[in-house]
Amino acid sequence: MLTFARQQQRRNVRWLLSLSLLVLLATLLSLCAGEQWIAPGDWLSARGELFVWQIRLPRTLAVLLVGAALALSGAVMQALFENPLAEPGLLGVSNGAGVGLIAAVLLGQGQLPGWALGLCAIAGALIITLILLRFARRHLSTSRLLLAGVALGIICSALMTWAIYFSTSFDLRQLMYWMMGGFGGVDWQQSWLMIALIPVLIWICCQSQPLNMLALGETSARQLGLPLWFWRNLLVIATGWMVGVSVAMAGAIGFIGLVIPHILRLCGLTDHRVLLPGCALAGAIALLLADVVARLALASAELPIGVVTATLGAPVFIWLLLKSAR
């Protein structure tokens, strides 16, 4: 038993080290790649000062943080709702952020600055989160809370569709592209959004013990002494914050929160002490690579990153499911 535990620990360490190395390599690729390839040796030149430090670096940092946030949100939701199909958009939080953003564009008539739009997106996500907490205070079961989140997401999606369909505002029509996900408008002015993500990401990565208990099921978690109502509310708020900030920076991006935790579990990383940092690293890698593809796939335009993540990720996910079923 001791030998097996040591082997498992070494295996987990190897996984985390490998993912950390891949994050570094993906970051280097993201900083170099673009319409003009800029090798690391040219980063201190005048061209590198503009393209790498002013354009690509803030974008790369945003992609890293959003990828980690979405993957961690998926891992938390899958443990919280005991459902491997749970993901950040499932509770309607992503759509709530979109409704907040669209309301800001309509009420501000396109005159609000970017930071104000970001705050409205976060506010929309947190409003949906507070509504979910209202349901949670009624001590609903996890399955009922999940259904409530799905219903809220449908309502928010309908509101966004109606607003965009009847709008003549060019800014609002541009939001349709934004809601597909993209980092094209990210620069150092969005650094406050990046900073807002970091403490929550670190805190979530340290919550392996309650999440391990929650993954055992509600009954087992109660028997182990976990204050279920408190932790469920706290984790829903943290997830709402991460998703709201992510949507404010990059729009709605699917696949990452659903598939990354599932892939790591299929690879044997089931303990949240390893799964949480693993999800943060793997989510950052996946979104960085998808962002590079989105930038380079077309010569004259940039693909929505949400389209890239779904196109690249769905076949891999199906292959892993078929492999695990054999």
UniProtKB/Swiss-Prot annotation:
Gene Ontology annotations for the cellular component aspect, listed alphabetically: plasma membrane
**GO BP annotations listed:** cobalamin transport
For this protein, the record's InterPro entries field holds: ABC_BtuC-like, ABC_transptr_BtuC, ABC_transptr_permease_BtuC
Membrane protein topology class: Multi-pass membrane protein
Q: Which residues cross the membrane?
A: 15-35, 61-81, 88-108, 112-132, 146-166, 184-204, 240-260, 274-294, 302-322
Location of the protein in the cell: Cell inner membrane
Keyword annotations for this protein, in alphabetical order, are: Cell inner membrane, Cell membrane, Membrane, Transmembrane, Transmembrane helix, Transport
Highest rank taxon of the organism: Bacteria
Record Gene3D superfamilies? ABC transporter involved in vitamin B12 uptake, BtuC
Q: Which GO terms describe its molecular function?
A: vitamin transmembrane transporter activity
Is Cell inner membrane included in the keywords of this UniProt record? yes
Classification via HAMAP family = BtuC
Q: Please report which protein family the annotation says this sequence is part of.
A: Belongs to the binding-protein-dependent transport system permease family. FecCD subfamily.
This protein's assembly is summarised as: The complex is composed of two ATP-binding proteins (BtuD), two transmembrane proteins (BtuC) and a solute-binding protein (BtuF).
PANTHER family assigned:
FERRIC ENTEROBACTIN TRANSPORT SYSTEM PERMEASE PROTEIN, VITAMIN B12 IMPORT SYSTEM PERMEASE PROTEIN BTUC
Q: What does this protein do?
A: Part of the ABC transporter complex BtuCDF involved in vitamin B12 import. Involved in the translocation of the substrate across the membrane.
Q: What is this protein called?
A: Vitamin B12 import system permease protein BtuC
Q: Per the UniProt entry, what species is this protein from, by scientific name?
A: Salmonella newport (strain SL254)
Q: Which gene encodes it?
A: btuC
